Amino acid sequence: MQTFYIIGISDNRNQFLSPEIRNLVSQGKVFSGGKRHHELVHAYLPEDAVWIDITVPLDAVFCRYEEHSEIIVFASGDPLFFGFANTVMRKLPSAKIILFPTFNSLQMLAHRILLPYQEMQTLSLTGRPWDAFDSALIRGDKLIGVLTDREKTPATIAARMLEYGYD
């Protein structure tokens, strides 16, 4: 049985990693995450670490995972909140998954502006179609927290809203 340790991290260059996570990382051999995650954590990895970039198509990534029994994955924020842990559970239902979440970007925003988080309708456009976003607009949701990516940026989202008559 494969074991995945999925560690949620922030975008902060000076990562806070608990002693438990630092110990896990120091003993790890195989690590994975996006290119940005690698940039953020490479200083913590052992010298002989193997890194598997999470890139699309994901089938190639999961083929590489098959070669290893334990993989430490770095993911953004809460790995279950529209995150990579969901993908691992879907693709490898028999895998053992141990999570170390941190705050996600929408939680951080809510905390910064003192907004009760449950009042925000949340959705992800990260590698996803516009459907959930369009539905939220059609429903008239007042507060929409959107996870973005390199293609569906805040500017792209604003342009789409203007195109459909929101100003």
Question: What role is predicted for each listed range?
Answer:
Residues M1-F103, Q107-M108, P129-W130:
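Class I S-adenosyl-L-methionine
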Residues Q2-I7, Q107-D167:
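Beta-strand/loop-alpha-helix module characteristic of Rossmann-like adenine-cofactor folds
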